[in-house]
């Protein structure tokens, strides 16, 4: 999957990300990846569900990947942060 079909979830309102996913599909993408880490994971799940249930019912979840990243902290240690990638597919 090309890197341009990835939506990174942050602190913006959920509907901003929903619009980004819908735009990707409308531009011809067959798959769109939604990626988030930490507290944004629940927002990523919300985005995927809103896209599927409200706007594009033909879209399905192809794959969900979860993992952990080690991020450096301000005091020089490392902190584990959870990650998720939800891949949506349009038939």
From Swiss-Prot:
This is DNA/RNA-binding protein Alba. Binds double-stranded DNA tightly but without sequence specificity. Incubation with DNA in vitro gives fibrous structures 10.3 +/- 1.1 nm in thickness (naked DNA is 1.83 +/- 0.37 nm). This protein does not significantly compact DNA. The keyword Nucleotidyltransferase does not apply. InterPro entries: Alba-like_dom_sf, DNA/RNA-bd_Alba, DNA/RNA-bd_Alba-like. HAMAP family: AlbA. The modification N6-acetyllysine is found at residue 11. It comes from the Archaea. GO terms for cellular component: chromosome; cytoplasm. Acetylated. Acetylation at Lys-11 decreases DNA-binding affinity.
């Amino acid at each position: 999957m090309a890197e341009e079909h990835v939506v990174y979830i942050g602190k913006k309102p959920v509907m901003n990300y929903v619009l980004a996913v819908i735009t990707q599909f409308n531009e011809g993408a067959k798959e769109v990846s939604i990626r988030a880490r930490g507290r944004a994971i629940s927002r990523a799940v919300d985005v995927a569900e809103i896209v599927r249930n409200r706007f594009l019912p033909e879209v399905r979840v192809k794959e969900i990947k979860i993992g952990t990243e080690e991020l450096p902290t301000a005091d020089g240690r490392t902190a584990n942060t959870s990650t998720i990638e939800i891949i949506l597919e349009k038939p």
